[in-house]
Amino acid sequence: MADADVDVGPVQPKKRTFKKFSYRGVDLDALLDMTSEELVKLFHARARRRFQRGLKRQPMALIKKLRKAKREAPSGEKPEPVRTHLRNMIIVPEMIGSIIGVYNGKTFNQVEIKPEMIGHYLAEFSISYKPVKHGRPGIGATHSSRFIPLK
């Protein structure tokens, strides 16, 4: 049994390959370098219409606040959260890495913007209702519920 020495040699660990992010076939670096006109062409119809009609004062103010928060953040740190009520704001590549407090009608839910969120609305990441947890039927829900004994 001692004669069965098998020389395996240095074992190299497998290199992990990560999926490179792309939005509609365009990688993230190219998205960040695009002009707004080129970027709008990649969005879905509703978002294209929204951007073609122009960004009004409030969405532009949010983007300016996000730029300021990123600029003032120390390198390697996350920027300060920026609170907003603009649930209908469409996420653009410039916002990636920012933290936004999106108002849901009661509280501000902090959302960290990731590349996968491009083209979506802020509201999609801050749910404004409490999902229903269906339980037992109440009294008077159906005719047969009259015969359900009360606890």
UniProtKB/Swiss-Prot annotation:
Organism, scientific name: Picea mariana
Keywords for this protein: Ribonucleoprotein, Ribosomal protein
Keyword Ribonucleoprotein: yes
Protein name: Small ribosomal subunit protein uS19
GO biological process, one term: ribosomal small subunit assembly
Gene Ontology, cellular component aspect: cytosolic small ribosomal subunit
NCBIfam families: PRK04038.1, uS19_arch
GO function terms (MF aspect): RNA binding; structural constituent of ribosome
Similarity-based family: Belongs to the universal ribosomal protein uS19 family.
